[in-house]
Amino acid sequence: MSSCSRVALVTGANKGIGFAITRDLCRKFSGDVVLTARDEARGRAAVQQLQAEGLSPRFHQLDIDDPQSIRALRDFLRKEYGGLNVLVNNAGIAFRMDDPTPFDIQAEVTLKTNFFATRNVCTELLPIMKPHGRVVNISSLQGLKALENCREDLQEKFRCDTLTEVDLVDLMKKFVEDTKNEVHEREGWPDSAYGVSKLGVTVLTRILARQLDEKRKADRILLNACCPGWVKTDMARDQGSRTVEEGAETPVYLALLPPDATEPHGQLVRDKVVQTW
């Protein structure tokens, strides 16, 4: 594979929204599309399903919870393509509303994958993004709702334009710690681990976009978060009002923003419209 080849990559892509995004990119992106999944058998089965539709994604194993797995993927992309053109961070988890798992465990597990692991993917793959690259973090309006349900001093911190990545990581760690000590409500946090994890993803998006502006402005990389809406997936227990194809529309729109585009950047986008933060 020549390092001149363009490549797009989707995490958590063996089913649901990730699978629909991959299918759409296979149709619309001029270059290779890499479908990644934690489970190799499920990932390869998803690739075969798309091949049966006349599409030709590649497969690479990726467990975002495993830093070594992320680094192996980074090395593959560097060797095969000399970098990465499009990254869609879709992998994530959510507990059922009626799940009996104690809230502090739900908080730790949810933030580990949705926030900390997503951040690790960005840490390893952003440095190999090529000029005019596009990064899309799948977030949720649940994150915005969580922000609104935070105490005012916490809201101010999350909205602050000078909040650093280290500050944000400390805040996310504090939420997990506060749930363990059963003081999260007293400390001003909302009662949704998923919401806080997606709040973290959206604020991380704002911070990483700012970093790109400071360090690589000439490369015109655009990095955004988006809410796909309430989609009929396993995660939503098929309760959603949107199809996975509808859920994929905004992520794919952001992934394929034209090379001369300068915005959106560092935004939360739903239905192709920037949301007020």
Swiss-Prot record:
Residue numbers of N-acetylserine PTMs: S2
Major enzyme class: oxidoreductase
Q: What keywords does the record list, in alphabetical order? A: Acetylation, Cytoplasm, NADP, Oxidoreductase, Phosphoprotein
Q: Which Cys pairs are S-S linked?
A: none
Q: Which CDD domains match?
A: carb_red_PTCR-like_SDR_c (cd05324)
Q: Its Enzyme Commission number?
A: 1.1.1.184, 1.6.5.10
Which catalytic residues are annotated? Y194
Task: Write out the GO cellular component annotations.
Answer: cytosol; nucleoplasm
**Family classification:** Belongs to the short-chain dehydrogenases/reductases (SDR) family.
**Could you tell me what this protein is called?**
Carbonyl reductase [NADPH] 3
